[in-house]
Amino acid sequence: MPAVDPVRLTADLVRCASVTPADEGALDILHDVLSDAGFDCAWADRGGIRNLFARWGRKGHPKTFGFNGHTDVVPIGNADDWSMPPFGAEVKDGIMYGRGTTDMKSGVAAFAAAAVDFVRDTPPDGAIVLAITGDEEGDATDGTTALLAYMAAQGEQMSACLVGEPTCPDRMGEMIKIGRRGSMTAWITFIGKQGHAAYPHRACNPLPALMRLMDRLASHKLDEGTEFFDPSTLAIVTVDTGNPATNVIPASCSGTVNIRFNDAHSGASLTEWIKTELSRIEGEFGVQIDLRIKISGESFLTPPGPLSALVSKAVKAQTGIEPVLSTTGGTSDARFVKDHCPVVEFGLVGQSMHQVDEHVKTDHIVELKAIYSRILTDYFA
């Protein structure tokens, strides 16, 4: 069996218009590549989402290296804004264009290619697992969590896991993610009493309460940062009255805030802080306030240790760059994997992800396969 070309495999995956929750054949392509190489493959579908589990080697082996990734992508927006077909995987001047070229079909292709070649040429004393989902860019309720549930039910496990998200800001090899901030969103509705703007004493205007609360939340310094995390941030993301009239005091208004928090906080502690602030505002302004909270993920950290050292060594050997260990950025499915085993993330340069004309250097895909190959070689040495 010839070596798997990660560039060709990336192109095959990109040509599948797998906008969440659609798969459009992407995971079937991966299934065939892995099963042909001797991987035991199974489907862990849930809620209409396709998820692929693949393992080479003995089930439950104490030395099992795992990889987690996704083949679903975000919408393309207006296709007319693209200079290349968004699902064409066309290459120009050494650059492949298309949705998912960076985030993260190239990462999935690079690891699959590395794993297939590795078990063919140097079968390890151990096992390799790939857990690939079609639900990362959406609600992520039936993706990696479904795969982990399937693994638990089947007695499958991973000793360590690498997530192939694009982690490098500008240069290939410059950053490994060893944790992520938590994320939560608060939707807050203020209910007053509608009235004529000329007679404010006959109404109860909820807007001053909204403005006061938003000012209190946004001006509060949550923390100074911790050893491995930057300071937590709070962003006001929506404010709405639904009131186009200039002579009417609105009956209600609403605002939304998003908090990205480090390990000085939890979703529960921040929820209590917001509730305390709401109580003060209710007492001061006499309005009714409704609160809805969604915690998308808690902060987590895989402390520097054997796994981050393993990946750092491979990255430096291939690129000559000593990668920074970071916890910056948004959420990823590593937030689910961290409850199963130690997890870090490493992948391509992510500058164009989710953008029009998303693209990747084909040389970087080849280099990423080489890095992943080094990781496997060193892990099973």
UniProtKB/Swiss-Prot annotation:
Matching CDD domains: M20_DapE_proteobac
Annotated residues for binding of Zn(2+) 1: 70, 103, 165
Keywords, comma-separated and alphabetical: Amino-acid biosynthesis, Cobalt, Diaminopimelate biosynthesis, Hydrolase, Lysine biosynthesis, Metal-binding, Zinc
Chain residues that bind Zn(2+) 2: 103, 137, 354
One matching Pfam family: Peptidase_M20
Cofactor(s) listed in the protein's UniProt record: Zn(2+); Co(2+)
Root EC class: hydrolase
Stated name of the protein: Succinyl-diaminopimelate desuccinylase
Organism: Roseobacter denitrificans (strain ATCC 33942 / OCh 114) (Erythrobacter sp. (strain OCh 114))
UniProt gene name: dapE
